């Protein structure tokens, strides 16, 4: 299914990405990424906060983000319009881009997995 959306979606991690922290602590903001995401949202795009945090640790992260001027369209969940579009809420976040300090691009992965 090829659906054309009028906006794009970024899902972003928290620890080590938005915030230089060591879970469950809160640390220094990644100001460059925060500014980028604010501009992205100002252009009409959507943001999903996608950390591994839950409970109080998640609530603290969301509050920390608000204090940095970041508001998210969803937290640890798909956007409601995506759920409606597909008729279910998959465990994998549907987005155009994932930003995470632990990510590995496919070309990098091919190099890592190459057996010589």
Task: Please report, for each region that a protein language model flagged, where it lies by residue.
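HAD-like aspartate-dependent phosphatase fold
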Residues: 1-116
């Amino acid at each position: 299914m090829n659906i054309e959306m009028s906006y794009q979606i970024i899902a972003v991690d928290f620890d080590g990405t938005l915030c230089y922290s060591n879970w469950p602590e809160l640390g220094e903001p990644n100001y460059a990424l925060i500014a980028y995401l604010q501009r992205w949202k100002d252009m009409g795009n959507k943001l999903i906060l996608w950390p591994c945090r839950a409970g109080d640790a998640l609530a603290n992260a969301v509050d920390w983000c608000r204090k940095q001027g970041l508001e998210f369209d969803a937290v640890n969940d798909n956007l409601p319009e995506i759920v409606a579009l597909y008729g279910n809420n998959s465990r994998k976040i549907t987005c155009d881009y994932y930003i995470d300090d632990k990510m590995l691009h496919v070309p990098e992965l091919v190099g890592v997995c190459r057996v010589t």
